[in-house]
Regions:
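Core nucleotidyl-transferase/polymerase catalytic module
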Residues: 1-146
Length: 146
């Protein structure tokens, strides 16, 4: 398992995890499940980002949330809470161990994730996106926004 970095067109440095075959294999089922769940959320534009403008064209106002290094910094503990709403504790604990319990090598150093989860691992983005939707939904409910 290793981490690689590269620059993107927005002049940000991206860190991507390259996991071993077995870790990716066990993560793939959850990855598929979570992405299918995201397809059912009408506000999500993961699969068609161009649809965003047509969804808001008649809105008086809208808010957009952009998080820098979201998968790397968003607490995996929050993602785990969301997953525990659907999966047993032992499953989610095993997911956490596969995601962040095993160290990565980056530039000859051994590193472990302390907060987020590794972009590049199956289920990484989808688990973050789903937890993010839950948080926004909760906030809207608390504020009386439908």
């Amino acid at each position: 398992r290793r981490l690689v970095s590269f620059g993107d067109k927005e002049l940000k440095v991206r860190i991507v995890a390259i996991l071993d075959y077995f870790s990716q294999s066990v993560l793939r089922g959850l990855h598929s499940y979570l992405f299918n769940t995201l397809k059912g959320i009408s506000q999500d534009v993961t699969f068609d980002q161009g649809a965003f403008s047509s969804k808001i064209q008649d809105w008086k106002y809208f808010c957009s949330v952009d998080l820098t290094a979201a998968t790397d910094r968003f607490p995996i503990s929050v993602e785990s809470l969301v997953l525990r709403g659907r999966f047993p504790d032992f499953y989610v604990s095993a997911w956490e161990r596969v995601m962040v319990g095993i160290p990565f090598v980056y530039q000859s150093r051994t590193l472990k994730y302390g907060v987020g989860n590794p972009m590049g691992a199956y289920s990484s983005f989808a688990s973050f996106a789903l937890a993010h939707h839950y948080i926004l939904y909760y906030c809207c409910q608390e504020l009386g926004i439908s």
